Regions:
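Small/polar-residue-rich loop-to-helix segments that shape phosphate-bearing ligand pockets
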Residues: 1-42, 105, 111-133
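General structural feature for long, well-ordered alpha-helical segments within catalytic domains
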Residues: 3, 26-29, 33, 58, ...
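Structural signal for hydrophobic packing residues in well-ordered secondary-structure cores
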Residues: 4-8, 38-41, 66, 95-102, ...
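Conserved beta-strand elements of the Class I
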Residues: 15, 50, 171-173
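Short glycine-centered, acidic/aromatic-flanked micro-motifs in structured strand/loop junctions
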Residues: 19, 80, 116, 147, ...
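Glycine-rich phosphate/pyrophosphate-binding loop at beta-loop-alpha junctions
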Residues: 27-113, 175-192
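Short helix-loop-beta connector
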Residues: 42-48, 146, 167-169
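Active-site-adjacent helical/loop segments in soluble small-molecule enzymes
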Residues: 109-168
């Protein structure tokens, strides 16, 4: 922040991109993602959207998109970094700014849902649930999850299924946010 302030004071035109691109501009990508989901929903009738949430941009964009497109599909984030309250606060603040940018209705804080049961030992640190989820999806579907976001998000989805949070008639969409390239950095964790 000091460097940015110094550069601006010297006349530089600076645009700071936060970690994960998680601000109202970055969240617009997931507003558009929700637009695509709505189009596909005519065919699939999704009853829930689940994804890993950390820096907040993905979930904020999806939630702002719900307001912008008047969509009622529930969105649940599986926190990979912060406790439930902190994560929900971060998502709400980013989603609120995104709604303001879109000039649409502002969501209520109660519309933000994040679970924190699948963080494990910490951000970027493997958990047993993540390892099991990542191995399962690779083995059954040949889909690679990253250990930091999607792996923990998918572990959360499996946990929700085990906890009977869905019915047989539910059609749940899991959003894989990428990052599988980081798997090689976690080779040691999968050898246990």
């Amino acid at each position: 922040q000091k460097i940015i302030k110094d550069l601006k004071s010297n006349g530089a035109n600076i645009y700071f991109i936060p970690g994960g691109g998680s601000n109202e501009i970055g969240a617009l990508g997931y507003v558009e993602c929700l637009n695509e989901i709505i189009k596909e929903n005519k065919k699939y009738n999704f009853t829930q959207i689940i994804h890993g949430t950390g820096s907040s941009g993905t979930q904020a964009g999806l939630l702002a998109g719900k307001k912008y497109f008047n969509c009622n599909i529930p969105v649940t984030g599986i926190s990979v970094r912060f406790d439930k309250q902190t994560q929900e606060d971060k998502v709400y603040q980013c989603a609120k700014k995104t709604c303001e940018l879109l000039k649409c209705n502002i969501l209520e804080k109660s519309e933000v849902t994040a679970y924190d049961e699948y963080i494990g030992p910490g951000y970027g640190m493997p958990s047993e649930e993540m390892l099991e989820a990542t191995k399962l999806l690779a083995k059954k579907e040949a889909i690679l999850l990253d250990p930091v976001y999607s792996g923990k998000g998918f572990a959360g989805l499996i946990g929700m299924i085990k906890n009977k949070q869905f019915t047989k008639s539910d059609n749940v969409l899991f959003i894989h946010t990428g990052g599988a390239v980081s798997l090689s950095a976690y080779e040691w964790a999968f050898k246990k």
